[in-house]
Amino acid sequence: MIELQNVYAWGIDGKDAGQFRNVFTDDVDAQYTTLMRMQGREQLSLWLETFHAPYDGTQHLFTNFAFTSDDDGVLMRSYVVANLFVHAYPGGENFVSHGYYLDRVVQAEDGWRVRSRQIINLWREGNVGLLDVGQQAVQNSR
């Protein structure tokens, strides 16, 4: 199951949508902020690809994995540090978000997949204006 986070991070940071989209079930339910919730692998994958595309670099680091099994699969909790970078961006080139992911992981025909995801942001540092770069890309794609 840890491999799911690794594949997700390498796919996002390598701008490889084909890689990270396979981490999720078809009916994934994902809440990336308190204001944004996406349902379905296609909607989530498109948003992730579009949001991260304009950055000169991103790096997602996962640690401190914890697992709890129940009848609905496995609850996987992991710390995340997500870095966004845009060269020569006004106000600062870097933004870093610290928090954790709460993932409901289920066994699918082709291996473990994330069925639900909630991101809990604990604190942020750097130029929060860099989030506008990804959000503007999403707005422009509509």
Where are these regions (language model features)?
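Short, charged/polar micro-motifs that form catalytic or ligand-binding hotspots
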Residues: 10, 34, 91
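Short, flexible micro-motifs
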Residues: 14, 43, 102
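Aromatic-acidic/polar surface patches that form glycan- and anion
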Residues: 1, 13, 37, 56, ...
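A beta-strand edge to alpha-helix "cap/lid" segment located at domain peripheries
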Residues: 53-142
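Short, low-complexity N-terminal intrinsically disordered segments enriched in polar/charged residues
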Residues: 1-10, 14, 18, 22, ...
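A solvent-exposed, acidic/Ser-Thr-rich amphipathic alpha-helical stretch
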Residues: 17-82
